UniProtKB/Swiss-Prot annotation:
The keyword Membrane applies. Residues 254-269 have a biased composition (Basic and acidic residues). This is Vacuolar membrane protein EC1118_1N9_3125g. The chain crosses the membrane at residues 93-113. One of its GO terms (cellular component) is fungal-type vacuole. Keywords: Membrane, Phosphoprotein, Transmembrane, Transmembrane helix, Vacuole. It comes from the Eukaryota. It comes from Saccharomyces cerevisiae (strain Lalvin EC1118 / Prise de mousse). InterPro entries: PRM (IPR051009). It is found in: Vacuole membrane.
Amino acid sequence: MVKKNFIPSVSLVRRDLPTLVTTTTSSTALSKPTSSVVSETSSKSLPSLTSSAFSTSSGATSSSSLIVASITPPSTAGNPFILNAADKPNGTVYIAVGAVIGAIFISILIWWLVSSYLSRRFTMTNSYANDSKNLYRGHHKHSSSLQSNPFDINDEKSYMQDDWDSMSQLESSQYEDAASPFNPIQDPFTDSRRSLFISPTLQVSQYEKSHSRHQSKDTNIFIDDPSLYVGTYLEEEEEEERKLNLNRPQRAASPERKEKKINSMEGYHKRNQSSLGLIPVASATSNTSSPKKAHKRQAPSMFLDDVLNGREII
């Protein structure tokens, strides 16, 4: 491709004309008449001319040519290394990146919604389970733990604690004749003792018997209604043992103190040297002491082990 440029030329000319001197010499030949030669010299000076004019030459033209190459990309037909983007929209890369970022944000939002829903559902389930376990009380309004007044909850807890305290006091009232909880092997009649005689075997046996008796009382308490059941079990045998322990033993170091467990009436007759009513009491004591005589064949250590384990009662 040839491109022609026409550039107009503008020139500024200033010049002076040179001074011209002309000398003319003429000679005339004399003819017959006499003539004089006239020599004429003339000097003529031309005026100086100054001309300043802008002249535009329309006829003078200058031409220049510039060659520009055209770039043609290769064809994508059948070329696996060139992406054919003719059928793709503009900004495909930006669309793909935006889609990935949006998917990440949507997944985070879904995870938050699911976790909050599961947490609320678990909390509601636990609160309903706890509310169903609580006992209904007339002065308390039964409502969910999520909607109830915290002051009402504290009042209900204190009321339940008072109920448990009353239950513990009811149970402890059944054990008024028991040993001290700080010392499991303790004689319950230490304060009222009038003798210096101490029998560890007798104390252990008394503790085992009282413990078994209290266990039976516990089963009876839990079987019956604790709010209506109030009572103490004072058996005749316990009263006799209590009266017997208050008495001074006849022989302080007697090896037969295991067989000194007799009826209170018999001890009364012995102290007062009375034989009234001894025959039926003796028959009763002989019947009760008959199985104990079989233990005379055992070693003392074996008998003590049986007493400690609760298999034997002194």
